[in-house]
């Protein structure tokens, strides 16, 4: 056990050293790569909960990622919202859409669920591409304002790097707490056998919809 903890501490230390390299070198390339890694890790974290722990195959995960991103961009560009207000608002709207879409979709199983979520992703992509000036079409929305911390604008990769990695760490801790909660135990039971979980008085439909909504906040 002590050896296992020792290895974990060494890996954590190695990870911190690796994370410190981009801001210390201030290399634009490594900083931009680090930002993208953190952003995609956030998406993968949610997918891991849905696919890895709940056992639900979703091929439309990127659709909700896009809905959140476009939602906050539209609120700031077209309606001139403060970015710090637009981000949680877009997240809540995306979670609500995930709940509404998940209610009928997660009643499907296997290949049917995979095809339904794949179709959702294709539909959302078409809507964004054909949205004209509202979504910016294939070119995306220009003029998205920077996040501000007081008088400090998060306008470069270094500042964004220092923001996204602590946020990712917080999300990892929240995910661990979720897995240790009653909902997390329900998800693992559904992954092993949804029929057996249902026979043990677990509301499998509610648990699946809840995790789908939570991971898209």
Predicted regions and their residues:
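Transmembrane alpha-helices and adjacent helix-loop boundaries
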Residues: 1-215
């Amino acid at each position: 056990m002590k050896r296992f903890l020792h290895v974990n501490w060494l890996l954590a230390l190695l990870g911190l050293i690796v994370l410190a390299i981009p801001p210390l070198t201030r290399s634009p390339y490594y900083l931009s790569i680090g930002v993208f890694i953190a952003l995609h890790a956030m998406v993968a974290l949610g997918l891991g909960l849905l696919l890895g722990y709940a056992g639900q195959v979703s091929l439309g995960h990127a659709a909700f990622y896009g809905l959140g991103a476009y939602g906050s961009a539209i609120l700031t560009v077209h309606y001139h919202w403060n970015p710090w207000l637009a981000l949680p608002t877009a997240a809540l709207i995306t979670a609500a859409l995930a709940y509404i879409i998940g209610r009928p979709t997660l009643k499907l199983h296997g290949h049917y669920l995979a095809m339904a979520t794949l179709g959702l992703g294709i539909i959302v992509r078409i809507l964004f591409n054909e949205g004209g000036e509202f979504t910016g079409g294939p070119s995306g929305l220009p003029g998205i304002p920077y996040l501000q911390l007081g008088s400090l604008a998060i306008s470069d990769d270094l500042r964004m790097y220092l923001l996204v990695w602590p946020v990712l760490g917080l999300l990892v801790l929240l995910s661990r707490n979720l897995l240790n909660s009653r909902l997390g135990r329900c998800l693992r039971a559904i992954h092993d056998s949804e029929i057996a979980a249902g026979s043990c008085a677990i509301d499998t439909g509610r648990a699946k919809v809840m995790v789908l909504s939570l991971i898209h906040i």
